[in-house]
């Protein structure tokens, strides 16, 4: 009865688990879904200029964004030989977090010869946001994973300030649990406010895009991506190889969310063309 009562809300853990399998016809489909609040999974779509049999699904949030104290965990499992595209129907808003930080963890498992695309729209960071984003990939032989982690800044009318911090960890593992590649980003509002040349400058949107897979023509991919992104307006891009022969990474910094989205679509279309021979259309969202 006399125990100390904290004024802070309890950490809230919410999970969605979605698995994909390949039908005898060759088409990929959702074979398992455990999706609770705030996640909502739309029906499986077949979209023009996608590879034959690819399953495209969109995740949405019913809560209006990410809030202080939340811990969201999304688990996507692409079975052997599946082709899967997962995105979001809209950008996710990370609201001001005065009491506690929030964490969003995404686990991607791509089994043998699977193609898994996890390409959500950028997270919108409000003033005083404190968010940790983590993406963990398990890569099986012959699998290909496209993934993106992106954010942009927004100050609603009548408010002021910058995000407290944004941290992103992207890690790629073998089926045995060996770390193949890792990428870490940590930035604070104070860093952004300084507008340092070579760090952020005047740019307010940033993304990391990766193609993860072994046995890829890395040098050809690097050259093609650099040529594709060379003349993108209002953006600065860098392309590099990941260690342990597990793919390529693209870092994009843009003036705003529109420029960032344009650059990311070009990177995605370039890689999809190289992998499947088909370039995707711009998606309406």
Curated annotation (Swiss-Prot):
**Keywords, in A-Z order:** Chaperone, Cytoplasm, Nickel insertion
Q: Name the domain of life.
A: Bacteria
Q: Where in the cell is it found?
A: Cytoplasm
- A UniProt-annotated Pfam family: UreD
Give a GO molecular function annotation for the protein: nickel cation binding
Keyword Nuclease: yes or no? no
Is the keyword Transcription regulation assigned to this protein? Answer: no
Which portions of this protein are annotated as coiled-coil regions? none
**Cellular-component GO terms for this entry:** cytoplasm
Q: What is its main location?
A: cytoplasm
HAMAP family named in the record: UreD (MF_01384)
Q: Quaternary state and partners of this protein?
A: UreD, UreF and UreG form a complex that acts as a GTP-hydrolysis-dependent molecular chaperone, activating the urease apoprotein by helping to assemble the nickel containing metallocenter of UreC. The UreE protein probably delivers the nickel.
What job does this protein perform?
A: Required for maturation of urease via the functional incorporation of the urease nickel metallocenter.
Family, per entry: Belongs to the UreD family.
> By what name is this protein known?
Urease accessory protein UreD 1
**In which organism is this protein found?**
Pseudomonas syringae pv. syringae (strain B728a)
């Amino acid at each position: 009865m006399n125990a100390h009562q904290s004024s802070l809300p309890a950490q809230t853990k919410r999970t969605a688990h979605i698995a994909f399998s390949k039908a005898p016809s060759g088409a990929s489909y959702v074979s398992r879904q455990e999706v609770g609040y705030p996640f909502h999974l739309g029906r499986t779509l077949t979209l023009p200029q996608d590879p034959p049999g690819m399953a495209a699904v969109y995740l949405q949030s019913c809560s209006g964004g990410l809030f202080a104290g939340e811990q969201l965990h999304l688990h996507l499992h692409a079975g052997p030989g599946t082709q899967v595209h997962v995105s979001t129907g809209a950008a996710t808003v990370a609201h001001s977090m005065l009491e506690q930080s929030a964490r969003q963890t995404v686990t991607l498992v791509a089994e043998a010869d699977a193609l898994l695309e996890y390409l959500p729209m950028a997270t919108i960071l409000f003033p005083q946001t404190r968010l940790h984003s983590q993406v963990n990939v398990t890569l099986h032989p012959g699998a290909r994973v496209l993934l993106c982690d992106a954010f942009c800044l927004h100050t609603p009318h009548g408010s002021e300030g910058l995000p407290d911090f944004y941290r992103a960890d992207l890690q790629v593992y073998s089926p045995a649990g060996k770390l193949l590649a890792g990428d870490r980003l940590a930035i604070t509002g104070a860093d952004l406010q300084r507008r340092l040349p070579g760090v952020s400058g005047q740019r307010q949107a940033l993304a990391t895009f990766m193609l993860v897979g072994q046995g890829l023509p890395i040098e050809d991919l690097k050259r093609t991506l650099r040529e594709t992104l060379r003349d993108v307006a209002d953006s600065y891009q860098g392309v590099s190889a990941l260690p342990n022969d597990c793919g390529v990474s693209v870092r994009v910094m843009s003036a705003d969310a529109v420029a960032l989205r344009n650059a990311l679509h070009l990177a995605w279309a370039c890689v999809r063309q190289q992998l499947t021979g088909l370039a995707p259309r711009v998606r309406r969202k």
